[in-house]
């Protein structure tokens, strides 16, 4: 039995205004998290829970997967990393050698502890303070390939989920 993984979308867009890009990132991540048994957290987003009721989108079955996550207490709006997220892991195509972890070793961690996987939104990815804070850095491709945010949102939970099925 594995512990729970949380996909943490870190807002590196505008921290003051609630943009369409924020809404679409949540709408894209919710069905992926639902499908692959991940929690979803948004960090440093300029919104409240009520704002999420107004996400009208054709992505994610019109928001039904986000609603499912909310109803099951598997969606979090946070301004800092919560202890229940477990081990903080930054997802990056340029992992620091001393913090580098493979996808397989990430799954092995999940046998004993929950993990929180940060994904940076926007062109700049995760800021240096988050990279320093994280215990590990995961390059999901293991090849240094930089993935577009939406691609990473899909690939990371999928890879972790399917690898966990092979142990």
Regions picked out by a protein language model, each given a short descriptive name:
Residues 128-167:
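Structured adenosyl-cofactor binding patch, chiefly the S-adenosyl-L-methionine
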Residues 52-56, 102-103, 150-152:
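Short secondary-structure transition/capping segments
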Residues 17-18, 50-51, 99, 126, ...:
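Secondary-structure boundary/capping motif
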Residues 1-3, 105-108, 112, 166-167:
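Short, Lys/Arg-enriched, disordered terminal segments
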Residues 1-94, 161:
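RNA substrate-binding interface of SAM-dependent RNA methyltransferases
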Residues 27, 31, 126, 134-136:
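Membrane-topology and secretion signals of cell-surface/extracellular proteins
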Residues 37, 85-86, 113, 133-135:
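Short, well-ordered alpha-helix to beta-strand connector turns
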Residues 97-130, 140:
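Long, charge-patterned amphipathic alpha-helical coiled-coil/hairpin "stalk" segments used as oligomerization
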């Amino acid at each position: 039995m594995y512990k729970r993984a949380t996909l943490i979308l870190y807002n590196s867009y505008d921290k003051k205004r609630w943009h369409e890009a924020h809404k679409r990132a949540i709408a894209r991540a919710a069905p992926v998290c639902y499908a692959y048994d991940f929690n979803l957290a948004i960090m440093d987003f300029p919104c409240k829970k009520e704002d999420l009721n107004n996400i009208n989108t054709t992505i994610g079955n019109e928001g039904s997967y986000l609603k499912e996550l909310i109803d099951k207490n598997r969606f979090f709006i946070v301004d800092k990393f919560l202890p229940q997220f477990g081990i903080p892991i930054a997802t990056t195509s340029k992992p620091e050698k001393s913090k580098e972890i493979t996808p397989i070793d990430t799954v092995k961690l999940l046998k004993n502890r929950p993990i929180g996987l940060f994904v940076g939104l926007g062109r700049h990815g995760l800021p240096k303070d988050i990279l320093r804070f994280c215990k590990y850095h995961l390059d999901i491709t293991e090849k240094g390939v930089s993935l577009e945010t939406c691609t990473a949102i899909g690939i990371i939970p999928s890879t972790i989920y399917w690898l966990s099925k092979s142990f």
